[in-house]
Amino acid sequence: MNFSANKYVAVVDDDESVCRSFSRLLRMAGYLPVEFLSAEAFLADRNRPHFECLVLDVQLGGISGIELGKRLAAVGDITPVVFITAHDEPASRLEAESCGCAGYFRKTDPGETILGTIRKAVESNHNQTANHQPL
């Protein structure tokens, strides 16, 4: 795989323990996780790095993860999004999938399964951006 040196992944979840757990998993896989406890904190951070992938909790207090994904897509941000949720509701799943997310998982799903989707999304995004660079 031909990745950039800094493989940042944002983890946006209002539960600190979930942020820590996902960050630990991502670090073990060679990623550099950056934690945000809300969508608002993510949007307000003007110094955030370029992220290879976003892991967004569906049901955040305030702006939801799905709404954050929609807002980013509306401004042309093509960063892959993986949604996680503690409450897997069919309507939320459909809404997330309609946003073109790379994956949708329950927080209790195996970490390796979620990580596999993150890896594929990052690789696909790299291939897509490499094919669109000027010669």
What are these regions (language model features)?
Residues 37-38, 64-68:
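Acidic catalytic/metal-coordinating carboxylates
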Residues 19, 61, 89:
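The feature encodes the CheY-like receiver
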Residues 44, 66-77:
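Short amphipathic alpha-helix used as the core "switch/output" element in two-component signaling
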Residues 35, 60-63, 98:
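Residue-level signal for the "D+5" position in two-component response regulator receiver
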Residues 67, 88-103, 109:
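Alpha4 helix (beta4-alpha4-beta5 surface) of REC/receiver domains from two-component response regulators
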Residues 35-53:
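Acidic, metal-coordinating helix/loop segments flanking the phosphotransfer/catalytic sites
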Residues 1-10, 16-23, 112-135:
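Non-catalytic signal-transmission and effector/linker regions of two-component phosphorelay proteins
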